[in-house]
């Protein structure tokens, strides 16, 4: 698995846990980082950056997801999909070195591995609309 995909997976793990437990993502992240054995994986820095970035801009990210998710509310989305969308939207808007197509395809691939059969198509459409229409 490529390093950045591993980072996205780790970020998803943290955001998923924070979402389920109703705790701040940065608090869950601190506990997660403490538990990682040394030497720490090279992709950890990118994962930490994703979680911290999503947490810092969560209101804006969630607002965009809610605006472009046709027929879905954030609360109705599967937890995995909601948090994959958060990571991808953060990358689309705030991580300049990641191409939009890469951010979208990575979210779709993780959804294919970890979520429902309909999730890849849903995320592809949602993220495609956000990439095309959202103000950056």
Curated annotation (Swiss-Prot):
Alphabetical UniProt keywords: RNA-binding, Transcription, Transcription antitermination, Transcription regulation
One of the record's GO cellular component terms: cytosol
BP term (GO), one: transcription antitermination
MF GO annotations: RNA binding
A Pfam family this chain is assigned to: NusB
UniProt key word RNA-binding: yes
KW Transcription regulation (keyword) present: yes
InterPro entries: NusB-like_sf, NusB_fam, NusB_RsmB_TIM44
PANTHER family named among the record's database cross-references: ANTITERMINATION NUSB DOMAIN-CONTAINING PROTEIN, N UTILIZATION SUBSTANCE PROTEIN B-RELATED
Family label: Belongs to the NusB family.
Reported function: Involved in transcription antitermination. Required for transcription of ribosomal RNA (rRNA) genes. Binds specifically to the boxA antiterminator sequence of the ribosomal RNA (rrn) operons.
Protein name: Transcription antitermination protein NusB
Organism per entry: Salinispora tropica (strain ATCC BAA-916 / DSM 44818 / JCM 13857 / NBRC 105044 / CNB-440)
Annotated gene: nusB
